[in-house]
């Protein structure tokens, strides 16, 4: 069931399905809740109530927000959890991985776990050596993202996606067309450009404040980093000792939940069982 939650003069669209403990899904920039099309039915079948969110400015959520930072998105996610009734585990990809971190730090009473998929969760340093060495992958992806950041280039974003999804799902041609059509809607490319200009430093500053378990999943072929596994280890190092776990999926890029959904589910379902089911006492809301 699609709901619209009022937030600061805008609306956040949330598609809720299933019954059971609450799992909130938040996609990355330039995308929509359709990004989780392979995970939602499996999570529902496993006995979870799934709230699949269109983050601000994307999908069926409104555009024209004053800000698109991870802190802004985190406030929306906490509002979703409180509206639906927690506790919840929040799954966030890319920019929403950082937002999920902030949400967990801000609302430990209702967020009991975080899954970060290919997350931008800490301030980035430019790896010149990796940039020069990895010319066919990391370097190419960075160049396309710079086109989006500097000029709001839709062709640049589509070229980036072709690199960022090295393991193409069977519906990739249709999915790529869907994304392109969505970004041609008025104001949507401006939202994407604004998101590329945000810094993950706000999320990195809150890693030490997180008190719930965190699972970081990196794609080994993610073009956003010269060494994706090293980025994951840095996130864990900034969390309180013992809270974080890292998994790297070989061959996956920046969208492991669409490229390798079975592998992601094999990691996420046990995590949910440990961090959510045992703490949930009821309160399902259809």
Region locations from a protein language model:
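Conserved alpha/beta-hydrolase catalytic His-Asp/Glu region
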Residues: 125-126, 148-208
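Conserved HGGG/HGGXW glycine-rich cap/lid loop of the alpha/beta-hydrolase fold
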Residues: 13-60
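Catalytic active-site module of serine/aspartate enzymes centered on a nucleophile-bearing elbow/loop
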Residues: 240-286
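Active-site loop/oxyanion-hole signature of alpha/beta-hydrolase fold enzymes
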Residues: 45, 52-91, 95, 121, ...
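Short N-terminal helix/helix-N-cap motif within the alpha/beta-hydrolase-1
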Residues: 33-41, 60-63, 98-99, 125, ...
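N-terminal cap/lid segment of alpha/beta-hydrolase-fold proteins
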Residues: 1-11
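Conserved loop-alpha-helix segment in the C-terminal half of the alpha/beta-hydrolase fold
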Residues: 211-252
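Flexible "cap/lid" loop of the alpha/beta hydrolase fold
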Residues: 101, 105, 112-149
């Amino acid at each position: 069931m699609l709901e619209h939650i009022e937030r600061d003069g805008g609306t956040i669209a949330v598609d809720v399905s299933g019954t059971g403990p609450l799992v909130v899904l938040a996609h990355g920039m330039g995308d929509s809740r359709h990004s989780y099309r392979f995970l939602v039915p499996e999570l529902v079948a496993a006995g979870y109530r799934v709230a699949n969110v269109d983050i601000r400015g994307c999908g069926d959520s409104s555009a024209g927000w004053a800000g698109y930072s991870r802190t802004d998105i985190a406030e929306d996610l906490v509002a979703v959890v409180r509206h639906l009734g927690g506790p919840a585990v929040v799954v966030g990809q890319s920019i929403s991985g950082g937002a999920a971190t902030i949400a967990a730090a801000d609302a430990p009473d209702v967020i009991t776990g975080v899954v970060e998929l290919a997350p931008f969760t800490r301030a980035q340093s430019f790896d010149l050596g990796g940039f020069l060495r990895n010319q066919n992958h990391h370097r190419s992806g960075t160049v396309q993202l710079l086109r989006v950041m500097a000029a709001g280039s839709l062709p640049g974003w589509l070229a980036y996606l072709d690199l960022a999804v090295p393991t193409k799902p069977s519906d990739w041609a249709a999915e790529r067309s869907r994304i392109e059509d969505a970004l041609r809607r008025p104001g949507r490319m401006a939202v994407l450009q604004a998101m590329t200009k945000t810094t993950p430093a706000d999320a990195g500053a809150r890693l030490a404040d997180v008190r719930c378990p965190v699972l970081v999943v990196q794609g080994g072929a993610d073009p956003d980093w010269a060494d994706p596994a090293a980025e994951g280890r840095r996130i864990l190092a900034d969390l309180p000792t013992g809270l974080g776990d890292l998994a790297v999926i070989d061959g996956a890029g920046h969208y492991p939940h669409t490229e390798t959904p079975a592998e992601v589910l094999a990691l996420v379902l046990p995590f949910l069982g440990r961090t959510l089911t045992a703490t949930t006492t009821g309160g399902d809301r259809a």
